[in-house]
Amino acid sequence: MADDIDIEAMLEAPYKKDENKLSSANGHEERSKKRKKSKSRSRSHERKRSKSKERKRSRDRERKKSKSRERKRSRSKERRRSRSRSRDRRFRGRYRSPYSGPKFNSAIRGKIGLPHSIKLSRRRSRSKSPFRKDKSPVREPIDNLTPEERDARTVFCMQLAARIRPRDLEEFFSTVGKVRDVRMISDRNSRRSKGIAYVEFVDVSSVPLAIGLTGQRVLGVPIIVQASQAEKNRAAAMANNLQKGSAGPMRLYVGSLHFNITEDMLRGIFEPFGRIESIQLMMDSETGRSKGYGFITFSDSECAKKALEQLNGFELAGRPMKVGHVTERTDASSASSFLDSDELERTGIDLGTTGRLQLMARLAEGTGLQIPPAAQQALQMSGSLAFGAVAEFSFVIDLQTRLSQQTEASALAAAASVQPLATQCFQLSNMFNPQTEEEVGWDTEIKDDVIEECNKHGGVIHIYVDKNSAQGNVYVKCPSIAAAIAAVNALHGRWFAGKMITAAYVPLPTYHNLFPDSMTATQLLVPSRR
């Protein structure tokens, strides 16, 4: 058995060697394969590792970029927030609400970290003092003067320059006393000065000194100063208010109308002043034409007064219209008197004794004139006019004579209230224009013209032509006040060289200050061209 085994082993030995070689070769191959596999694995691992590293790096980069972006965003947000906060602070600083005091903003201030001193200052500035709530007492005037006392301290100024201001008047009159108030009178429509003003002084003693400044130049124009006539104006206003009576309907007389004027035409003229209750135009029963007069009744007396002021003398169809008051008698009847006739107003009528008495009574109404007791008794005894058949008329008409008398009286009163005190000296304005005068000796010609004119009223003892004055002023001194008054009345308002002459009195001391040589002048002057 052993031999068999050996023989078999011997027979199988070469095959085993080949198998061993093959196995060794296979082992080497396997090892090499394993090595190759391991190498490839290591390389793949390395590749994988490198790729993972690169991925990690890219991720890190992306993370860093995102973080930087987030940081930038956060920074920009913070900047925006800081800007908005600064804007809020500015807004709060400019416009402080009543709820922005220390009680409401203490937490915010704590975060901002303002100093304690600033907080206190803001608190003090924002907190309202309890003493400021009380209003300051109204200042009372230093001296409570009555209107009459204030009028005694006031002067009236005329012939003022167009560009003058209250400050200029105050500086001008401060040389004679302390000025309390200056009131310039201006036109209510154009707001331009009318050339007049009232100046009130603190002391009464300053008034005569201010009047002595008449003739002094203020802004190149000689001023006229006189005492205020406010007390007379106040008395006239009170009397006018008493005559006005209570409000209510008022009837007006309208006369001197053209015969073709109709009631509709009168309504169109008078209705803009107020509501009209009735219009009665007197017609001639024979001819059917208007008699030239009528009556208009207004619902409101104020409207009637406005119409009376504006339309009296208004030219209608080439004739000045006459408008007057109508007062009713207690025993009035509907019939109108013959005195209502406009034709009778122009031609007049021969009345008897009773008629003259009644006409006197009617003309005396509203004027304050007293009728003698005997005339009043005669009027009470007679019940009608001398014509007998004519019934007692119901309306009293303001006749043209009465209207003219009242107009003249008011004009004289106004002139008396405005006209300054007359003296021997006066000033003539608008006598020449220095810019247009080119002839040699033109001032001598003007002087001779004035002397010739004044010699008709008493003469001249001194005259001066101010060749440099833009107003064309000529100063004249007469031997007496009567001569000066006559010359002023003759020259004032006259036209000379295309301009209207203005004459104004100059106080004697002022004239002597301007022309010292006139103090000793006594000889009457004659024209040099004689």
UniProtKB/Swiss-Prot annotation:
<feature type="cross-link" description="Glycyl lysine isopeptide (Lys-Gly) (interchain with G-Cter in SUMO2)">
    <location>
        <position position="244"/>
    </location>
</feature>
<dbReference type="GO" id="GO:0005654">
    <property type="term" value="C:nucleoplasm"/>
</dbReference>
<dbReference type="InterPro" id="IPR003954">
    <property type="entry name" value="RRM_dom_euk"/>
</dbReference>
<comment type="subunit">
    <text>Interacts with NCOA6 and JUN. Interacts with ESR1 and ESR2, in the presence of estradiol (E2). Interacts with RSRC1 (via Arg/Ser-rich domain). Interacts with SF3B1. Interacts with ZNF106 (via N-terminus).</text>
</comment>
<feature type="cross-link" description="Glycyl lysine isopeptide (Lys-Gly) (interchain with G-Cter in SUMO2)">
    <location>
        <position position="111"/>
    </location>
</feature>
<feature type="modified residue" description="Phosphoserine">
    <location>
        <position position="341"/>
    </location>
</feature>
<dbReference type="InterPro" id="IPR006509">
    <property type="entry name" value="RBM39_SF"/>
</dbReference>
<dbReference type="GO" id="GO:0003723">
    <property type="term" value="F:RNA binding"/>
</dbReference>
<keyword id="KW-0010">Activator</keyword>
<feature type="region of interest" description="Activating domain">
    <location>
        <begin position="291"/>
        <end position="355"/>
    </location>
</feature>
<feature type="compositionally biased region" description="Basic residues">
    <location>
        <begin position="33"/>
        <end position="56"/>
    </location>
</feature>
<keyword id="KW-0508">mRNA splicing</keyword>
<keyword id="KW-0804">Transcription</keyword>
<comment type="function">
    <text>RNA-binding protein that acts as a pre-mRNA splicing factor. Acts by promoting exon inclusion via regulation of exon cassette splicing. Also acts as a transcriptional coactivator for steroid nuclear receptors ESR1/ER-alpha and ESR2/ER-beta, and JUN/AP-1, independently of the pre-mRNA splicing factor activity.</text>
</comment>
<feature type="cross-link" description="Glycyl lysine isopeptide (Lys-Gly) (interchain with G-Cter in SUMO2)">
    <location>
        <position position="119"/>
    </location>
</feature>
<dbReference type="Pfam" id="PF15519">
    <property type="entry name" value="RBM39linker"/>
</dbReference>
<feature type="modified residue" description="Phosphothreonine">
    <location>
        <position position="146"/>
    </location>
</feature>
<feature type="modified residue" description="Phosphoserine">
    <location>
        <position position="117"/>
    </location>
</feature>
<protein>
    <recommendedName>
        <fullName>RNA-binding protein 39</fullName>
    </recommendedName>
</protein>
<feature type="region of interest" description="Interaction with JUN">
    <location>
        <begin position="291"/>
        <end position="406"/>
    </location>
</feature>
<feature type="region of interest" description="Disordered">
    <location>
        <begin position="1"/>
        <end position="146"/>
    </location>
</feature>
<dbReference type="Pfam" id="PF00076">
    <property type="entry name" value="RRM_1"/>
</dbReference>
<keyword id="KW-0597">Phosphoprotein</keyword>
<dbReference type="GO" id="GO:0050733">
    <property type="term" value="F:RS domain binding"/>
</dbReference>
<keyword id="KW-0507">mRNA processing</keyword>
<dbReference type="GO" id="GO:0015630">
    <property type="term" value="C:microtubule cytoskeleton"/>
</dbReference>
<keyword id="KW-0677">Repeat</keyword>
<feature type="compositionally biased region" description="Basic residues">
    <location>
        <begin position="64"/>
        <end position="95"/>
    </location>
</feature>
<comment type="similarity">
    <text>Belongs to the splicing factor SR family.</text>
</comment>
<feature type="compositionally biased region" description="Basic and acidic residues">
    <location>
        <begin position="131"/>
        <end position="146"/>
    </location>
</feature>
<feature type="modified residue" description="Phosphoserine">
    <location>
        <position position="136"/>
    </location>
</feature>
<feature type="region of interest" description="Interaction with NCOA6">
    <location>
        <begin position="406"/>
        <end position="530"/>
    </location>
</feature>
<dbReference type="GO" id="GO:0032991">
    <property type="term" value="C:protein-containing complex"/>
</dbReference>
<dbReference type="InterPro" id="IPR012677">
    <property type="entry name" value="Nucleotide-bd_a/b_plait_sf"/>
</dbReference>
<dbReference type="GO" id="GO:0006397">
    <property type="term" value="P:mRNA processing"/>
</dbReference>
<keyword id="KW-0694">RNA-binding</keyword>
<feature type="modified residue" description="Phosphoserine">
    <location>
        <position position="100"/>
    </location>
</feature>
<dbReference type="InterPro" id="IPR035979">
    <property type="entry name" value="RBD_domain_sf"/>
</dbReference>
<feature type="domain" description="RRM 1">
    <location>
        <begin position="153"/>
        <end position="230"/>
    </location>
</feature>
<feature type="modified residue" description="Phosphoserine">
    <location>
        <position position="97"/>
    </location>
</feature>
<feature type="modified residue" description="Phosphoserine">
    <location>
        <position position="337"/>
    </location>
</feature>
<feature type="modified residue" description="N-acetylalanine">
    <location>
        <position position="2"/>
    </location>
</feature>
